[in-house]
Amino acid sequence: MTMSGTAEEALRREYVIGEEIGRGRFGTVRRCYAAATGEPFALKTTPKAALRELEADPLDLALAEQEPKVHLLASAASRHVVALHAAFEDADAVHLVLDLCPGGDLFALVSARGPLPEPEAAGLVAQLADALAGCHRRGVAHRDVKPDNLLFDASGALRLGDFGSADWFGDGRPLTGLVGTPYYVAPEVVAGKEYTEKVDVWSAGVVLYMMLSGTVPFSGATAGDIFQAVLRGNVRFPPRAFAAVSPEAKDLMRRMLCKDVWRRLSAEQVLRHPWIVTRGGSVAVN
């Protein structure tokens, strides 16, 4: 993939572009290095041409163009957010220079190891909730929390990445739009309603369920079937997968996967839940 003119020139003055290390729906992620120091980073490039095609959703282009600003705001939210170090943008593409997270992602971890022990899962959820609480305090909703977007840095700490679906909220401005991933999206999003930042807590609840069982709570043969299961919102804990899971962990999942948004926990409340505090240890809020 070739990068765009002026943005590419500015980028290449400061960074040496390396090999491709990932690919998303619209763009690629490459390794890059600071020209002055040799420090490694990840470079996410989103070309705008595909987002301007007739059949493309205009929301996708709008989100790509605002991603640098939203991600910059989120970068200061928590040490568990993948930091944005530089952004280069012109009419053709958006290039983001990000923390390099060489430890893979949570989806790969659970795929390789199967269900995680409760203390480990609690520690990871604490880190995720810290990232979300920080973002929410700054008026940023991620809107695509899923294991693929939860990365591990060189020290093994969890980092929330990919703010390509993120948006601002607050001051009476509701969130709208069907964004996210079917297995992890909250029912109020599927229903086409206005919604709040608590959609991220629902998604984090699905992530916790997946960490403890190796499966997801809402599934189906098609995206439509999955959405119907999400709308029903019946959270079950099959004995085969959850026989060894504690009542406290199940209580937290029920509170995160609560269809009633007003009763659903906030990210801050997740951090204070007894299962997180006693098994995962509390994470210092930045």
Task: Set out the residue ranges of the language-model regions.
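Conserved N-lobe ATP-binding subsite of Hanks-type protein kinase domains
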Residues: 28
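Activation segment signature within eukaryotic-like protein kinase domains
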Residues: 124-125
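Conserved N-lobe beta3->alphaC-helix segment of eukaryotic protein kinase catalytic domains
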Residues: 46-74
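Conserved catalytic-loop aspartate of Hanks-type protein kinases
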Residues: 200
